[in-house]
Amino acid sequence: MAPEMSEKGPVLRLLRPGPIPREDLRKIAKVIKPKRTKADHIEAPGQIESHYAPATPLMVIDKPADFVPEEGVKYGLLSYRGEGNSSLMEATEWAHTEIMSPGKGKLAEGAVRLFYCLRKLDAAGVDVIISESVSETGIGVAIMDRLRRAAAGSSQK
């Protein structure tokens, strides 16, 4: 975020979603998203489309029913809350599972653990990482932004 002043008060240029939700920032300042022109005008590494990408292909699944596992593929699961909270848990036999917010279901904890869990899955030797989506409210907007960027470079969609 880069603060600026205008005749009407403070203006925040939101480079990418972060831990403070846009709705909260709007309470204290006007919030704008900078216009993107060329890749060489990127102001923060997180603005690069695939900045957060693991080496292992990553797919973000919004609806568990949309995931159909392929035979012979070793899948890793990035789960938000873990057992009993996702029908993705039952979709296949997972080669490795990482849970962002074990037993708690707290978006803030999920945000803190996101890259730790992605790196563990990347090192686990799976063929594809499957990630559940999270609610796009509050810090969930930032989590989904990071997940989409991580999946952007994947050959599998």
What are these regions (language model features)?
Residues 1-157:
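Active-site-adjacent structural elements in enzyme catalytic cores
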